[in-house]
UniProtKB/Swiss-Prot annotation:
A motif ('KMSKS' region) lies at residues 299-303. One of its GO terms (molecular function) is glutamine-tRNA ligase activity. This is Glutamine--tRNA ligase. Its EC number is 6.1.1.18. It catalyses: tRNA(Gln) + L-glutamine + ATP = L-glutaminyl-tRNA(Gln) + AMP + diphosphate. ATP binds at E56, P57, N58, H62, I63, G64, H65, A66, K67, S68, T257, R292, L293. The gene is glnS. L-glutamine binds at D93, Y238. Pfam families: tRNA-synt_1c, tRNA-synt_1c_C, tRNA-synt_1c_C2. Coiled coil: none annotated. Its main location: cytoplasm.
Length: 590
């Protein structure tokens, strides 16, 4: 897709089928029998196609991860019914004890489940393989494919060279396998300080791909691990762990984002070296890359998201303005809408920007058919029906959903004092304004229909000492009630919503906008903090119709004429509703 693109539509109006080059690869592999009749190391039959989702538990998942989750679990689900079957493994890549935490690990699993995916019995941790990874490292050492380097981290970095200069061999590169093995075991046994030695693969310091210049694969870290405790003081790095974990889990298609494209030769080198040494057998896994998700008005850098939280630009990881899964869930996006969004944007190898409106439209399309309707007055203005008896009330009703009559009706009363939206009245109406305005000269005030109620005519209005409008007065027409024969005698252009002041339920409503004013806050040399939107959250006191009194957290509604709202996951309670605006009825982002 082009910059800030949206899925295209066909002439018939249907959204075009998104591209997915990975399906073509898998189809080819299935047709060729590349992964047919596979068995694991124990000789047990396994599916032909195995994908995996392997996040590091060092932060909360975000919308970009959702794309990868939907891709990997979605491919497995789609191919599971074909010959040979398929599955997706869930793996936590927990090899860095310094940055990882149980809180993050639990949140990751909760996010994947919330999105609607199930890994069954196939939940793995990279830390499960620490013993095997160490064993394989020793095998590489014994076969002169790895060595212990005693240079400082700065010297290792300097001697790697750069794109225009080849690297320099470490003075320790020609240590014998026995020397390396002894040092590596002493590293394991805790005899050295952090950073005193590392284990490097012995590849080629003149390789044009800097990743292949004897990469570091083990380092000393005297830090307890959240799962293995103090058992280990050396830990494998991602590039070493990732491919071996894939091979141990019999992954067929290891799918990651484009930033790992330069790491693929290293992935292949490690797996193929261990295959040559008899550790693995064909077919070994292969890595494929796809373009990461770039969503307008959004950042997905873990470091920058952490900065937003720590510097209190937002109210935590689950702030509804955050692109984290916990944030967009609290905002009111549904699992179905996220999956629909990921399906629509497709998968490609070319970086592009996806317009935020694509995500919002996916939510509208999901909730249009299944969100109950409700009335909410967000910016209340009192409306007094002068010719209506204050001691009287008139029963009214409205469908819970216009296309689901089986859901029944909402019941409420028409009374003398009502709440309407302040925007539905203008003292001096502009051209094309068909809602309430007072008499002008010899012309009577405007007439509007109060939805599911009566037609009223504006007679006058009242203001406070500062000139602020505090009350609008109207007369109603008793024979104009909606649903009665007389209602057809009144032709009005304006149709507004209302709530009886006697029945209105007070509520806190939070109106969210983009967190950033720039559609590309993380691009170029700009400071993303300079683009923070100071008006990204507005908290207002609103009124809801009486049926909303006992809503539960995460109940979703379409507030008619406003948009889709959700009862806040944390703060809303029966009798004290708090709602978040998820998205408006129409795309209003500029």
């Amino acid at each position: 897709m082009s910059q800030d693109s949206k899925p295209t539509k066909s002439a018939a109006g249907a959204i075009a089928e998104p591209s997915n080059f990975l399906r073509q690869i898998i189809d080819h592999d299935l047709a060729s029998g590349a992964f047919a009749q596979r068995t694991n190391l124990a000789g047990e039959a396994i599916p032909s196609i195995i994908t995996r989702f392997p996040p590091e538990p060092n932060g909360y998942l975000h919308i970009g991860h959702a794309k990868s989750i939907c891709l990997n679990f979605g491919l497995a689900a789609d191919y599971n019914n074909q010959s040979g079957g398929a599955r997706c493994n869930m793996r936590l890549d927990d090899t860095n004890p310094v940055k990882e935490d149980v809180e993050y690990a639990d949140s990751i699993l909760d996010a994947v489940k919330w999105l609607g995916f199930d890994w069954g019995t196939h939940l793995y941790h990279a830390s499960d393989y620490f013993d095997r990874l160490y064993e394989f490292a020793e095998i590489l050492i014994q076969n002169s494919k790895a060595y212990v380097d005693s240079q400082s981290a700065d010297d290792i970095h300097t001697n790697r060279g750069n794109f225009g200069q080849v690297g320099k061999n470490s003075p320790y590169r020609e240590r014998t396998p026995d020397e390396n093995l002894q040092l590596f075991r002493e590293m394991r046994d805790g005899k050295f300080k952090d950073g005193e030695h590392v284990l490097r693969l012995k590849i080629d310091m003149a390789h044009p791909n800097i990743v292949m210049r004897d990469p570091v694969v083990y380092r000393i870290r005297h830090t307890d691990h959240h799962r293995t405790g103090s058992k280990w003081c050396i830990y494998p790095l991602y590039d070493f762990t990732h491919c071996i974990s894939d091979a141990l889990e019999n992954v067929s298609h290891s799918i990651c984002t484009l930033e790992f494209e330069n790491n693929r030769p290293l992935y292949d080198w490690i797996v193929n070296s261990l295959k040559e040494l008899g550790v693995f057998k064909d077919p070994v896994p292969h890595q494929y890359e796809f373009a990461r998700l770039n969503l307008t008005y959004t950042i997905t850098s873990k470091r920058k998201l952490l900065q937003l939280v720590e510097e209190q630009h937002v109210e935590g990881w689950d702030d509804p303005r955050m692109p984290t899964i916990v944030g967009i869930r609290r905002r009111g996006y549904t699992p179905e809408s996220i999956r629909l969004f990921c399906e629509r944007i497709g998968v490609s190898k070319a970086d592009s920007w996806i317009d935020m409106s694509t995500l919002d439209q996916a939510l509208r399309d999901d909730l249009e058919a299944r969100a109950p309707r409700a009335t909410a007055v967000l910016k209340p203005l009192k409306l007094v029906v002068e010719n209506f008896d204050a001691a009287h009330s008139e029963a009214c009703s409205a469908p819970r959903h216009p296309h689901h009559p089986e859901w029944g009706n909402r019941e409420f009363n028409f009374t003398k004092e009502l709440w309407i939206e302040a925007d539905d009245f203008m003292q001096e109406p502009v051209k094309g304004f068909f809602r309430l305005y007072p008499p002008i000269g010899d012309q009577p005030g405007s007439r509007v229909r109060l939805r599911h109620g009566f037609v009223v005519e504006c007679t006058d209005f009242e203001t406070d000492a500062k000139g602020n409008i505090t009350q609008v007065n109207v007369n109603y027409f008793p024979d104009s009630k909606s649903g009665t024969p007389g209602s057809n005698n009144y032709k009005v252009k304006g149709n507004i919503h209302w709530i009886s002041a006697a029945e209105a339920i007070p509520a806190e409503v939070r109106l969210y906008d983009h967190l950033f004013t720039d559609p590309h806050p993380d691009s170029g040399d700009k400071n993303f903090l300079d683009t923070i939107n100071p008006h990204s959250k507005e908290t207002i006191k609103a009124y809801l119709e009486p049926c909303m009194k006992d809503v539960k957290p995460e109940d979703r509604f379409q507030f008619e004429r406003h948009g889709y709202f959700v009862a806040d996951q944390n703060d809303s309670a029966p009798g004290k509703p708090v709602f978040n605006r998820t998205v408006g009825l129409k795309d209003s982002w500029k």
